[in-house]
Design a protein with these regions (language model features):
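Short glycine-enriched, charge-decorated loop/helix-capping segments at active-site entrances
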Residues: 43-54, 140-148, 213-219
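N-terminal [4Fe-4S]-dependent radical SAM core
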Residues: 1-53, 248, 254-260
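Conserved AdoMet/S-adenosylmethionine-binding subsite of the radical SAM
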Residues: 66-67, 74, 83-213
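Conserved alpha-helical substructure of the radical SAM core
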Residues: 43-77, 86-87
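Short, hydrophobic beta-strand segments that form beta-sheet elements in well-ordered domains
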Residues: 28, 104-106, 243-245
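Auxiliary Fe-S-binding modules of radical SAM enzymes
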Residues: 2-9, 14-15, 180-260
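Short, solvent-exposed beta-strand edge segments and adjacent coil->beta transition regions
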Residues: 23-25, 72, 170
Length: 260
């Protein structure tokens, strides 16, 4: 089922990448996910927005997209995990046929599906989320049983995106509780081989839906920003390719994003 919100998401690019960022992106969320990440509010049993998801037939979907086009041509497909939507290829094609730009979020678990979408020119900006520095950490974060889902497949997805001409790739990881410079370096090394990839760091977005017993908290904002500045200074490959979203304000407001 879908949750659709008009002009809500701030594009996480500067505009220098040939992407129109004058308008925010419409958000199209799919309710299903194959991960249960500890920091994701949608994984919480307390998540209270489930009633905002609705089924849409093809004619209804087309009508909604056409109406949204009048106020902006950027569309962000997210979730949940949008590759689980059995109609995702058709949904994306509708947006592209109407002249839209597609930002596509994925946890990277389904690289073959993503490759199909890329090969058909249905993705303009691919955002892939990392779940840990090691396969073991990724398993613990994503709460899945098969390591390939949250590790090997993720790298395949990044590689497919990086090798697709004209597609921008953003790799995201979420920081919480504490982070060291050495950890940021290790994360950057994992994706450094993929030419042109952007490295995005989200400080934990606090939510009333996150159970307090998890003990998750934001990293000190100034400390994290200073570590990222150091990374860019010492590793020139990342200059103008690091994106920092410190809190939930930066999700929906462009001036809440720091580009380094």
């Amino acid at each position: 089922m879908y949750r659709i919100r008009k002009n809500i998401m701030a594009p996480k690019l500067t505009g220098n990448e040939g992407i129109n960022i004058e308008n925010k992106s419409h958000l199209i969320m799919w309710d299903k996910c194959n991960f249960r990440c500890v920091f994701c509010f949608q994984s919480s049993k307390n998540f209270a927005c489930k009633e905002q998801y609705h089924s849409l037939g093809k004619d209804e979907y087309i009508a909604v997209i056409m109406k949204l086009m009048a106020s902006g041509r950027n569309f962000k497909f997210s979730g949940g995990e949008p590759t689980l939507n059995p109609r995702i290829e058709w949904d994306l094609q509708v947006v592209k046929d109407l002249g839209g730009t597609i930002f596509f979020d994925t946890n990277g678990s389904n690289p073959d599906k993503v490759k199909t979408l890329l090969d058909k020119g249905l993705i303009d900006v691919l955002a892939v989320s990392f779940k840990g520095l090691t396969p073991e950490e990724a398993l613990q974060t994503a709460k899945v049983k098969k390591q390939e889902f949250c590790w090997g497949n993720v790298f395949k997805t990044i590689e497919y995106g990086a090798k697709t001409p004209g597609v921008k790739v953003i790799v995201t990881h979420v920081c919480y509780n504490d982070v060291t410079y050495e950890e940021l370096i290790e994360y950057s090394k994992l994706i450094e081989p993929y030419e042109g990839v952007f490295y995005k760091i989200n400080n934990l977005h606090q939510s009333r839906y996150l159970p307090a017993e998890l003990g998750l908290k934001k990293v000190d904002s100034n400390n994290l920003l200073n570590l990222l500045k150091r990374l860019v200074e010492e590793k020139p490959r990342w200059k103008e390719h690091v994106i920092f979203v410190d809190d939930v304000y930066g999700v929906t407001n462009y001036d809440g994003i720091v580009f380094l």
